[in-house]
Amino acid sequence: MFDKYETYNFFYDSRLAEYMIPTWPYDPILLIRKLSNGESALIKPAKGSLGSGVIKLNKIGNEYFAYLQTVYPDAVFSTTRELFFYINKVMVKNPYYIIQPFINFMKDEDSVFDMRFLVQKNGDGVWQITADLCRMSFDDFYVTNLAYEIIPVQDVLKQLDLDETIMTQMKDISIEAAMIIEEKAGPFGELCVDFGIEENGRLWIIEINGKPDKSLFKEISHEKTSSIAPYNTI
């Protein structure tokens, strides 16, 4: 599984840099600076945790607000000491964290969604998109790990009347991402690329997973999966 900060560094000098969410190693001083500047921040384990340990943070007036999975505050603090005591309790099981800006992603009604593309090598070693899906969050959740519905990406694009060229763009980016990571990290056979669309229409890569959970992809045919070459998976 890819380290999120390492993955970010794979792309910072590539054409895909504009799609990568800015990422920093966890630093309490940096976090407070961003919150004091009126930014909302997301802190999360550097390696995937299925949404566990992810905290959204912001500062309103003199108070700090912490959110776990939903848009409703889990806790409110009046001092940084209280805030960091709370954060440290969450981080105890996974001390290596990162900081990212919190991005307001587009919703379908009250459901945030992300779009996942499975990229695999065929028998000739050529990267191809073999499946896609869209995870719809429960209402008022800001994470999609506990999705209430999984639908094809094309369906959500139609529901929101989004330009269908976005589909082609995400496929092209996914294949290019696989090629870049292989160049940086060595041969492997498959990965997933997760995308989100910001409310202003900007496309972002949320995450790249080198050990995809293929059970989510109900639309992958037996013919496609049986043709995948036996490459190493990171």
Model-assigned labels for residue ranges:
Residues 60, 118-122, 196-200:
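Short beta-strand micro-motifs enriched in acidic
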Residues 1-40, 45-59, 64-65:
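Conserved N-proximal alpha/beta basic substrate-recognition cap immediately N-terminal to
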Residues 214-234:
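Charge-rich, low-complexity intrinsically disordered segments
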Residues 55, 67, 111-135, 205-208:
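Beta-strand scaffold of nucleotide-dependent catalytic cores
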Residues 195-211:
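A short beta-strand motif that forms the metal-chelation/ATP-contact edge
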Residues 88-106, 122, 127-131, 136-196, ...:
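A long amphipathic alpha-helix within ATP-dependent nucleotide-binding catalytic cores
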Residues 51, 135-141, 209-218:
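Glycine-rich phosphate/pyrophosphate-binding beta-alpha loops
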Residues 16-25, 42, 61-110:
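Conserved ATP-binding module of the ATP-grasp superfamily
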